[in-house]
Amino acid sequence: TVLAGRQVAATVNAAIDALSEDLRQAIVLREIEGLSYEEIADVMNCPIGTVRSRIFRAREAIAIKLRPLLGTREGERW
């Protein structure tokens, strides 16, 4: 429903806001701006492995916040 979609969007936004600056910048550049890992590494002036790690950690943190809303448990994907 529209209400559920809004609730998910609000939860995702709150989860992104709660991330550390490095994690937030990496996930926004990837998922919102659509940059490649290589482009993000250039923008953030760090190795590509660091970018991959930051994006992974950001996605995990967001997933943890979404679990109660989506009715999933740890280890499950939606």
Task: Walk through the language-model features, giving the residues of each.
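Short, Lys/Arg-enriched C-terminal cap helix and immediately downstream tail that follows
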Residues: 24, 59-78
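Acidic, proline/glycine-rich intrinsically disordered inter-domain spacer in sigma factors
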Residues: 1-14
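Intrinsically disordered and other compositionally biased segments
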Residues: 3, 54, 66-69
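Glycine-rich ATP/GTP-binding catalytic cores of kinases/NTPases
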Residues: 2, 36, 72
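Intrinsic disorder/low-complexity segments
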Residues: 50-53, 76
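Helix-turn-helix DNA-binding module
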Residues: 13-25, 29-50, 64
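Residues within the DNA-recognition helix of helix-turn-helix
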Residues: 11, 54-57, 61
